[in-house]
């Protein structure tokens, strides 16, 4: 029987162990997609308690706690103390066997705080106090955590109207770790609620200095902000979409749709889809002009619980995997850009694992030889960001594409304690490849190439792909 979470955690063969310890573990972290709050990095934020850094905003843990019968006040309530919230999490942890939260929890305790104890009601107070003592030390600040995990680059997620003042402040402070913005223009195509769209466009006008009275004006304002993001080091865009949009439309139609929604009138479903289709193409062309990588996270059904959405707002643990038939639209969208010679580097992230092979085969349709792995299958996202999901994603990519050109892992997290997910991924990767070597499916004579592949997927591919 193996010990829990020892140095060979998840590494089931000798080859896997060598691959991880001698090659994957030493590589720095490039976290090219996350949701860290830039101000916390700029201010080198000092965390007040383990609850704040660990439970604050963590909807993964909140979902588990609710499922375990914990009252909402201990998840998001304002009338409970940090200790009371942590105590309820500690009571939940023993019920999370086989859930990735159990592994993440103990990996984070071990790598961040040097704690090997199992979190339970019996150990909760001891662990809480020990972690809080360490969090009071300078090396456990926001920047300290990034240094601790050998982070080299982080890319935050930012709206076109964001000032990026904290990115600028961080860079000018001389902080050695790069914090770069990512262009996330979802609100610029969110035309479902006319009043919200108009309010956003008015903010865009104010920030860009462009008077907006028609569609062309809005695009001019967005281009100006796109240029500003590029000046601040942006290399990627990101789009959170339910499904891909690829309706047929004319320029005249899109201009008329803008006038209608900007004037306060509700759009038909067809008009909404046409507008989103046009905007995705325009954003794709902008990214191509600058050599950026466009990312698409698709397939989530968000805010399912109306009661809790009204109470807590979005991103609080009430989203789930959707079931959308989107392969044809995805193909049509990518083809539109490709036909015009404006398909930039692209990463596709699915939330429904049923689409793994759909994406893995879609990649090959649009690889053009200009760069290795130009169209990428993104690492297991959200509900798939765990051992089983990672293995399925990498297996599909291996069978139908080139695993060796994969740009690897990202945290997609709001937490400064999420960097061990890179270790979790690397261990899973090494175990997967190591097993093939041990089974005689990869020749031992090619170990130098295998070793290089592990280092590339862990770090080198991302560094070269994004030109950091």
Swiss-Prot record:
It catalyses: D-glucuronate = D-fructuronate; aldehydo-D-galacturonate = keto-D-tagaturonate. One of its GO terms (biological process) is D-galacturonate catabolic process. Signal peptide: none annotated. It is an enzyme of class 5 (isomerase). One of its GO terms (molecular function) is glucuronate isomerase activity. Pathway: Carbohydrate metabolism; pentose and glucuronate interconversion. Keywords: Isomerase. It comes from the Bacteria. NCBIfam families: PRK02925.1. Belongs to the metallo-dependent hydrolases superfamily. Uronate isomerase family. This is Uronate isomerase. The gene is uxaC.
